[in-house]
Amino acid sequence: MSRISNIYFYYMLVRTIIQVKGRKNMEKKRILITAGPTNEYIDEVMKITNMSTGRLGIELTKHFLEEGANVTLIATRSVFRSGLYEKYGLSNNPNLKGVPIETTEDMYNALESESRESYNMVIHSSAVGDYKPEFSFRMEDLATELAQAVHDGKTTREEILSILTNPNCKVNDDTKISSYEPNLAVKLTLTTKLIAHLRTWYKDAILIGFKLLENVPKEHLMEVARKLCIKNNMDYIIANDLHDLRQGQHLSFLVNEDGYQNVEFHSPDDIYETAKSLVLNIN
């Protein structure tokens, strides 16, 4: 055997040993991943959602399963029914626990419930909606209610605001709202910030979150991600810009409490390799 052949042989041998050892170590790891959007319902049919498909979460789930890890995936039902999920055959993997949800409240309950288990890493890639419908109303009805209040002498800011935030003219949303309401309005309210609870629930896990802004300077994106990391006691935030995504550039950056870590990602594979390195370095 030539010297070059010898070198190549030993290189491949060492590489194989490292891969086998890495897989054995990964088989001991438990990973929790959230993916896709959340759905907030206006009535029994209409909903508020976002553009997230859950692809990143599915890709990460696939990679971790291939390495032998045990994965819990919390995602909307649309993610579990997606072509990519079926393409990878994830539904038949015994190491995958799928937890279907719809709303932010559902995901909150699922995350809280799963915290009774021990996880090495939590990757919170779900695009959780910031707002949810509180109630719907017809603008004509609200105008009538406000006019009556003014007639009754209720003209202070606090009195008007009280009617606006809790009117008597709410539309019943227990069934489908009529399709012929020309002036239907929906009052939104904030959803629970799930990222704020992760460290309380998963004290010993590596926590990775995400931050998406649109068309901002890179320095601003990094600073917002850094502050998010500190505020919620996360280990890392992966930051990206919607402008880049729309241009077909899947560019994102790794940030921790100290700021940008000089690590760029250009694909889900890149994110997985970093996550893998992090989780294999813990005992």
Describe the predicted segments one by one.
Residues 7-25:
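Short, Lys/Arg-enriched N-terminal segments with co-localized hydrophobic residues
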Residues 2-5:
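Serine residues within intrinsically disordered or low-complexity segments
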Residues 26-283:
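A cross-family phosphate/adenosyl-ligand binding-site feature
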